[in-house]
């Protein structure tokens, strides 16, 4: 697969727009992460209370959870209500077909450590593996490609064995990639992770051309439905205790405390006490983490559904302190809000209520909000949404470039296909790269807001004359 530089850069941005965090413990004090603290086999032939659905309504049957894109802007996703601190996760998946359709299986932490499997519907014979540390997107040599024949016609098992010393990727039990902290060059994922799976349309015609090209081409929505099946998810948490707490803001695994337990550097899949898949966390502090919504960054996404086809305004407001604007170069209908540090988050569905808005999309220090979803509560975490559409945004900033809101100086992706060999060397290599953050967005927002206010006043004064 060969991509232009624009496709690589904007495609990377599109993928990063899918992962986010509600409260980043490297920047502020956050609630504890409820632990699985054992092993569980989640057969998804029926709904599991331990996985929360957003961006669409899954159905359940013999093939497991059906995550269906039935219309434009659907982006169904399952997110666990628990975390693991080193462990093993195996997703049994049949990826969604369709040009431009992206299926993902992801581990994601509150501080944006991330481990991904990603499938492109237009390329049913390979899968991509990827990783990120603390949301760092300064290099584009982390992804690898692996043979995965007929992945949208047949079920296969995609697993990650994540320890302090090594992360191993498996396809149907075969080791296809190993990642060590040294190979990760300081970006090794090492903080408590949630488990996710979902799909979205990277080929939506309102997205940037680079995003569409990365996803494999423009999606033809006359061919819906596009369905990803998740038959089961097996999870082992190698550590113990009722919850995980960040003792400081270093993001090192040694700084993670297991309350009433211990952090174990490694373990064995299936080990530890068996956790009933229907059992909800009982720790008093977990209520702040039960997903009241949420997505994609680097991995799974949630460019979730707008409910109108109208064009969004360039600058929107929702509440007294959440001015939002779009940035040139962002995928369509993603805008930036000043109530945070800036970055990329995907839209949330207008159909989702307040009780569905704090899990994956809103769990973000990349405080970006969508212009396409209805206003909803945000649990006090600075994430805002308002009604709009999926058309391509305009605004300040450029990609790449300089100035407020721009994403300057991104390197050209280099490297080769990781292939599917056993024990491949790591570091990743690919022209595609999830997760590109848009820095400096807060200043851009203030500039745009002030400029619009001055313009409005000037027009009003002129009219009076």
Swiss-Prot record:
Residues 1-21 form the signal peptide. Residues 261-325, 339-442 are annotated as: Disordered. This is Crh-like protein ARB_05253. One of its GO terms (cellular component) is extracellular region. The active site is at 114 (nucleophile), 118 (proton donor). Disulfide bonds join 23-30. GO terms for biological process: carbohydrate metabolic process; fungal-type cell wall organization. It catalyses: Random endo-hydrolysis of N-acetyl-beta-D-glucosaminide (1->4)-beta-linkages in chitin and chitodextrins. Residues 22-223 form the GH16 domain.
């Amino acid at each position: 697969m060969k991509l232009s530089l624009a496709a690589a850069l904007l495609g990377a941005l599109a993928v990063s727009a899918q992962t986010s965090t509600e409260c980043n413990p490297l920047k502020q004090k956050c609630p504890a992460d409820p632990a699985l603290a054992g092993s569980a086999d989640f057969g998804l032939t029926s709904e599991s209370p331990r996985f929360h659905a957003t961006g669409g309504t899954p159905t359940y049957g013999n093939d497991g959870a059906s995550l269906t894109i039935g219309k434009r802007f659907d982006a169904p996703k399952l997110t666990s209500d628990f975390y693991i601190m080193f462990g093993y996760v195996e997703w049994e998946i049949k990826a969604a077909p369709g040009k431009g359709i992206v299926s993902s299986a992801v581990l994601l932490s509150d501080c944006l450590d991330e481990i991904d499997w990603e499938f492109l519907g237009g390329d049913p014979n390979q899968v991509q593996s990827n990783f990120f540390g603390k949301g760092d997107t300064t290099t584009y040599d982390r992804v690898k490609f692996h043979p995965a024949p007929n992945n949208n016609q047949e079920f296969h098992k995609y697993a990650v064995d994540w320890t302090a010393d090594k992360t191993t990727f498996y396809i149907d039990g075969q080791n296809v990639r190993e990642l060590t902290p040294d190979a990760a060059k300081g970006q090794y994922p090492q903080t408590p992770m949630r488990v996710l799976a979902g799909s979205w349309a990277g080929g939506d015609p309102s997205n940037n051309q680079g995003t569409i090209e990365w996803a494999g081409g423009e999606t033809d929505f006359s061919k819906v439905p596009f369905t990803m099946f998740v038959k089961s998810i097996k999870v082992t948490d190698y550590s113990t205790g009722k919850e995980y707490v960040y003792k400081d803001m270093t993001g090192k695994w040694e700084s993670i405390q297991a309350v009433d337990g211990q952090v174990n550097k490694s373990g064995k899949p299936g080990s530890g006490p068996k956790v009933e898949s229907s059992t909800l966390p009982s720790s008093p502090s977990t209520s702040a983490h039960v997903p009241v919504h949420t997505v994609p960054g680097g991995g799974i996404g949630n460019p979730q559904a707008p409910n109108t086809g109208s064009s969004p305004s360039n600058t929107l407001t929702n509440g007294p302190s959440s001015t939002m604007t779009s940035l040139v170069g962002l995928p369509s209908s993603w805008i930036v809000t000043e109530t945070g540090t800036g970055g990329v988050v995907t839209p949330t569905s207008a159909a989702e209520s307040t009780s569905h808005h704090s899990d994956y999309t809103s769990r973000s220090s990349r405080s970006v909000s969508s212009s396409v979803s209805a206003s909803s509560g945000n649990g006090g975490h600075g994430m805002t949404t308002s009604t709009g559409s999926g058309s391509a945004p305009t605004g300040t900033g450029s990609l790449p470039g300089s100035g407020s809101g721009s994403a300057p100086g991104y390197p050209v992706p280099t490297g080769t296909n990781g292939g599917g060999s056993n024990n491949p060397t790591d570091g990743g290599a690919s022209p595609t790269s999830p997760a590109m953050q848009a820095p400096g967005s807060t200043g851009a927002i203030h500039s745009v807001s002030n400029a619009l206010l001055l313009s409005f006043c000037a027009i009003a004064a002129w009219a009076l004359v």
